[in-house]
């Protein structure tokens, strides 16, 4: 029956599965089912032939195309159309290549589907086919746009009439509506619209969707398809299509709708006149009877979408003279149900016998209009005609529940595909894969609704309901087996056959490509609802059917809805069944598909403003279009999920949905496959059942947008756990050492030097971060132990120190001192290893480089300023301005820090005056503010050192220039004031108004906090006293008269804060009284305070009540205490109360730890003892106060206030001891007044004594204090505490403690038994202590060795006793080895070996049994203990005096250097040869021999030159050179410091390279107390030498 292509014809309804381009009017568009080209939306039409060749069966596999998972729906039977109308039939099924051409699909993916309609000749002069409109103008209403397949575009006067199916809501902005009227040609054109429409809405149609421009897919996204015959005379007529409320879809003009595959029709169908009665063709299905349905479509003017009134198919013409579209539906012989269930597609019957005539200007006929006839009963009894007054609204955007509301449904004619058996629908859909339609369009609005209202409703509905339509479509597609709601009405067998044939021949083929085109359209035009669907992925509201409006008559669908599903449906998933139930419910004509809340807009309220809540709109979240990525959008990874297109069949990983508000998962347990159950939160997502939307072919939940989020998140593609995820790997990833491979370790070895360097820098950085005045000495020791042995490391260390110094100017003094200590550091250069570079040179170069950096900074600032001026926007300009200001601020801070650091280096004599003058001149020349600020900082730092007598003229010039700058007032006031401050500073002889604000020690901080707290306490007490007076009121008078509690029983008013509790600077007290007039025991401050001179600032704060009682019991006539009368008047309670305050305040003042509390108590007890003896007869003249001495020491040690107080306490104890001696002389010995001290008390006293001794190193005082403890049986506590407290202190502290114990042993105050007992308690724990103190054995040896050195205890006895607790532990040898090592350093190994042998010691006593003694001795190098090495006859340890005499004799005799060498080797032991004694004796002898004893004394340089070799041999290192200089200093002192003598020696020694400059600098800065005699004069005499030395070094550095 294929007809030749016609020259004219209406645009055919686009087949959903076929890409079809739009063609210009008048061009034919033969359909070629081949792989379409991906073209643009507005691709120009391509002339194609209207001939439909035989099409192959559509592939059932879903792999090559996106197809609905719903079963196939039978297509409508072909209809008989009038003779003369050309019909293009599709005799065979069409093959579906898996093409991915460009698609134009409604925006929400619910594109309209139109069966390949038969084309009819176009009458010339017919009305235009929506000129100017194009598919791209309308996003959702128009049918799918398939540019890859040619479609004929007819002249503007012809309107195509594709069948309208339930179309998903779209987002295109424009649309025109047309009223479709269906007439039965067999009944004389009777209007059977209402009959058909009322009977066709029971459920989604199983016919394959036919999407034309105006086809409406049903709510599940699919549109039933029927063969359509477009009559030429109806092309000018439009169809007004109503939107379903709640499913927003954009308006579309008919031009939007994509023509289906064109089928030229032989003759035009008769056009119904506006006033004519509708002509409905009764469906006669027996045999091949053909029924023609003429659909009269009334076209209304474009109306705003605000009205959602359904369009009615009124028999009378609308005022707009809408064209009537006739649809002829011809059904051939029915197809048995078995065919639907048995085979996906039966062989199509000739299309000639299965045609539907739809008269619609845009070539689209709503599917709802066709469904009734398609599903008519087998008898094909003509349905009762609906009253012409009740128009049947048709929703082009798949809003069926509103279309037929109120339209009576003919029970006899149930043309809805839902009535078909679901088996058939399943199988047909399996082959055709059309999207199932959740519901047909029930009538929703009364006939009185106007088109304008309808369009108003549509515009809002389509934007929101489009999502719901898509959700329904997606649901139907996802459910692999879901096809029809269980309540669908079964189709008679004969009708089923016809439906299947028609579907197979005409529409089934279009489904797959329709899916792809929906995706394409979503890619291109999804801007409104589509993007909303991607942006907000919320669970869809379950689409629950609404009760029909009052005026609606439920059609036969209600009957069909009650039909249970067939038994075969037991295999379907719950998801599919839920969708079917949902679809069937929503298709009922008298019901609304969506449930509208009471306060929500309803389709019936046409004039009301449309409002939809969030849940309602979220119901459209999972529609098909929402699951596709629109084409043409920018790549926005945060918004668009790319993989939704590429892998639509991938099952959703439920673990990705844990955070989604999703409903309960109703998937049966056997289908979960071990997946985690989703949490039951939020509204259900998929449908009424709340199950997850199913993916195509039922492969599990479709991956969709996630639930509502409080904050936007990235949409991350679901990744299966089985996928191999490639992680980004860094090329040089860090690995812990334990994880590194051999290759990594090899590379690490290659870079070992670099890693060591970096480790060095890290350690230096750590030390610098901890550098404080208090920690300086400890940290400097760590620095000197670092391996700074290359130029690179030295430069790196210098850079670290320098950067730290200039960034922290307040600590520049500490950093400068560190540099001073490192000044002598030398390392070989990288280029010339033989040439060395020293620390000082590199540091000065670094300072100079930073000082001269101003020019570079200026260039950078100019560049930034230029960039800022050229900035285009104000924002960019502001940003650049901030950067410029920040850069200038940083440069300024660096300059100031550098200047301060340079000044501190100069003060330490590391820079010469010449350099500093150069800096001052350079800064003074530049009158910019930065330079002047640096100048002020520099002069403030070093002005006092530069402003000496010789340099005053130069300094005057500087300050005159500064005064000029101030007077000119060309600089800012800030700089002028800074300059003025420097002038004032010089005027005040460089004495600043405020002290140095540098860093403070912890003790200073504690003391300041203590003073502040004390002041606050005073204020509080004063306020309390005032407040109590005010509260009591009454006349002013004595406090006792007002009952003030601060008055004691004796009538004395106790001051709230006694003076005794205030911190007192005892150093100021000597200014008040003469040193000799103060009795250190009698001066008491405040009753009970008992602050004495001897007690320091802590004075007796810890006195006990018993002490106070004893004081109160003293006779008032005591002349030794001028305050004794006052003392007696104070009751014990008052003193006790005040004493508490005093104790707390004093403890804060002293800054001691909690452990020192006992120290205070112990001192107070001593104070009590003293108080007890105050009343005894003593002669003040015989007593001498030690306070003056203590104060002098305090001046020498300002940083040791604690030591000062302890020294004062020791002094008082010593005075007490003297008193006791005198008493013993006059009286017989008396036992102490109080009982012996307890262990706890003794420990507290011992702690105080030891602390005081270690601070002052006053041996006599300490011995006397221990003697006064009068507890010889408990002195082991003193020993134990002494060893324990010094174990982790410095070596000097341990040495001093050992000497104190030795002295106590020698004096008899400490027995050896007590000494050993005290040591045992420590030695027993030594092995455990070794974990925390690795060098514990060395430290113990340092404490024990002094006893042996002085001969206090024999070596044998001592070694055997102290090793008793260590032998079981096997540690005895460890301690002895350390002791022997220290003894060898002091007396030589031979003397130590002699002592060892004399004591009869053997290593066998101290080593574990079985250990090889010989191997041990050899390993530890203690062979001298075995006596194997005999001392040479001539070698002996000469005393220093004898050595000096012998060397002087040799040199006086003029002995050669070699002879002196020989004598030394022959007569001195090896130990003495390398000792400092030989160096000092040799230096003294050589220098003395070089002096020319004339007036004035001079140096014979020739002698020194001759003896240079002799000195150089033994002055082998810097330490020996320093000892030589000490010897020279002592020699000059003995000669009474002859002028210039030392300078001449220094010059000669330096010139002969006997003493190197580093040793000179070390001597200059040495603070060794043993070498201070005459040091000041000597240093002054060689000032010129050191000045010259530094200048010469500077010159060499510059050269």
Swiss-Prot record:
Result for mutant: residue 696 to L: In a colorectal cancer sample; somatic mutation
Domain MI: 1241-1363
Effect on the protein of changing residue 180 to A: Loss of PABPC1 binding
Reported impact of residue 990 to A: Slightly reduced binding to EIF4A
Site (Cleavage): 674-675, 681-682
MIF4G domain location: 565-792
PROSITE patterns: MI, W2
Segments for region (PABPC1-binding): 172-200
Impact noted for substituting residue 771 to A: Abolishes binding to EIF4A
Outcome of mutating residue 776 to A: Abolishes binding to EIF4A
Domain W2 span(s) in chain numbering: 1433-1599
Omega-N-methylarginine PTM positions: 73, 110, 685, 694, 1032, 1042
Any one of the GO BP annotations: energy homeostasis
Annotated positions of the Phosphoserine modification: 15, 314, 1028, 1077, 1092, 1145, 1147, 1185, 1187, 1194, 1209, 1231, 1238, 1596
InterPro entries membership: ARM-type_fold (IPR016024), Initiation_fac_eIF4g_MI (IPR003891), MIF4G-like_typ-3 (IPR003890), W2_domain (IPR003307)
SMART domains, alphabetized: eIF5C, MA3, MIF4G
Impact reported for residue 977 to A: Abolishes binding to EIF4A
Primary residence: cytoplasm
Stretches for region eIF3/EIF4A-binding: 682-1085
Biased composition regions of type Polar residues, renumbered to the chain: 34-48, 289-304, 1116-1134
Region annotated Disordered, chain positions: 1-77, 166-222, 239-319, 332-600, 667-713, 731-757, 1024-1227
GO molecular function: ATP binding; eukaryotic initiation factor 4E binding; molecular adaptor activity; mRNA binding; RNA binding; translation factor activity, RNA binding; translation initiation factor activity; translation initiation factor binding
Subunit comment: eIF4F is a multi-subunit complex, the composition of which varies with external and internal environmental conditions. It is composed of at least EIF4A, EIF4E (cap-binding) and EIF4G1/EIF4G3. Interacts with eIF3 complex, mutually exclusive with EIF4A1 or EIF4A2, EIF4E and through its N-terminus with PABPC1. Interacts with EIF4E or with EIF1 (mutually exclusive) through a common binding site. Interacts through its C-terminus with the serine/threonine kinases MKNK1, and with MKNK2. Appears to act as a scaffold protein, holding these enzymes in place to phosphorylate EIF4E. (Microbial infection) Interacts with rotavirus A NSP3; in this interaction, NSP3 takes the place of PABPC1 thereby inducing shutoff of host protein synthesis.
Disease implication from the record: Parkinson disease 18: An autosomal dominant, late-onset form of Parkinson disease. Parkinson disease is a complex neurodegenerative disorder characterized by bradykinesia, resting tremor, muscular rigidity and postural instability, as well as by a clinically significant response to treatment with levodopa. The pathology involves the loss of dopaminergic neurons in the substantia nigra and the presence of Lewy bodies (intraneuronal accumulations of aggregated proteins), in surviving neurons in various areas of the brain.
Record protein name field: Eukaryotic translation initiation factor 4 gamma 1
Lineage: Eukaryota, Metazoa, Chordata, Craniata, Vertebrata
